[in-house]
């Protein structure tokens, strides 16, 4: 197995992307590993050590030092070390974030919102939100306005509730005159002087008209009851006959009422002439 050359200039170190301290650490690990490989007779893992040293120095570009890119053996070595595995995960996350900036911005907004919600609200008035102060003062202002408007509304109700007082008091002479007039009307009614119709309209005629009205109403009810008891085929003829009877009685009643009105009309000029 050919022995690897441990020496390197500062230019090569800068090309590899390694600082001076990391390069010395790499050389120590290289010598130790080479001695172990000589004893065990296995292959050289110089490329894996270069990648590990690059990750330890947090230089992302130093992973390109190994020619041909990292092979399966390098990945296995890196994943076997816990701190290297973490660095690889962070690098993969950065690549994903670069490819999808929208998801990264959404994640940032979620983190910012969570921080805002986590901030406790201070009880002091100096650090409190002015919007919350205005909302807290609104109900107080409403209460004050209601209290101011209540006495005004009460005064208006009191003014409306007091009715206008009218004086219904009259003299004793007026009351006595009204009493005499009512008594004279009552005496005229009892003596027969007070009549609804003229002198030509007798009480018998008025009673006749009243009897005819009652008879007509009673006949209407009786005919309607008989009509319901009849079958449907005979109801039409019965209703026609009942209608004729009612019309004849109504004509008789109308004529008697007209006679009363004519007698009253004749009585009016007689009274005016006398």
From Swiss-Prot:
Record's keyword annotation contains Coiled coil: yes
Domain of life: Eukaryota
Pfam families: CCDC28 (PF13270)
Keywords from the UniProt entry: Chromosomal rearrangement, Coiled coil
UniProt feature coiled coil, ranges: 234-263
Residues annotated as site: Breakpoint for translocation to form NUP98-CCDC28A: 76-77
Region of interest called Disordered, as start-end residue ranges on this chain: 121-166
Residue stretches of biased makeup (Polar residues): 122-138
Connected disease: A chromosomal aberration involving CCDC28A has been identified in acute leukemias. Translocation t(6;11)(q24.1;p15.5) with NUP98. The chimeric transcript is an in-frame fusion of NUP98 exon 13 to CCDC28A exon 2. Ectopic expression of NUP98-CCDC28A in mouse promotes the proliferative capacity and self-renewal potential of hematopoietic progenitors and rapidly induced fatal myeloproliferative neoplasms and defects in the differentiation of the erythro-megakaryocytic lineage.
The protein's name in its UniProt record: Coiled-coil domain-containing protein 28A
């Amino acid at each position: 197995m050919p022995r690897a050359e441990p020496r390197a200039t500062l230019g090569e170190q800068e090309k590899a992307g390694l600082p001076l301290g990391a390069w010395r650490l790499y050389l120590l690990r290289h010598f130790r590993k080479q001695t172990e490989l000589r004893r065990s007779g296995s292959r050289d893992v110089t490329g894996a050590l270069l990648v590990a040293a690059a990750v330890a120095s947090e230089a992302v570009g130093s992973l390109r030092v190994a020619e041909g890119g990292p092979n399966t053996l390098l990945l296995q070595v890196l994943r076997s070390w816990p701190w290297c595995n973490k660095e690889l995960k962070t690098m993969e996350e950065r690549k994903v974030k670069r490819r999808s900036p929208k998801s990264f911005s959404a994640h940032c907004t979620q983190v910012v919102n969570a921080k805002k919600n986590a901030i406790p609200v201070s009880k002091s008035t100096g650090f409190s939100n002015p919007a919350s102060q205005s909302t807290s003062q609104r109900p107080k202002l409403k209460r004050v306005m209601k209290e101011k408007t209540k006495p005004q509304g009460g005064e208006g109700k009191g003014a409306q509730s007091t009715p206008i007082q009218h004086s219904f008091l009259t003299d004793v002479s007026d009351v006595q005159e009204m009493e005499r007039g009512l008594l004279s009307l009552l005496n005229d009614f009892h003596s027969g002087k007070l009549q609804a119709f003229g002198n030509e309209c007798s009480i018998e005629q008025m009673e006749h008209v009243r009897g005819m009205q009652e008879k007509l109403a009673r006949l209407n009810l009786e005919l309607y009851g008989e009509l319901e008891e009849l079958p449907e085929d005979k109801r039409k003829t019965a209703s026609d006959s009942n209608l004729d009877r009612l019309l004849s009685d109504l004509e008789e009643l109308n004529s008697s009422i007209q006679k009363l009105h004519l007698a009253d009309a004749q009585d009016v000029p007689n009274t005016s002439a006398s």
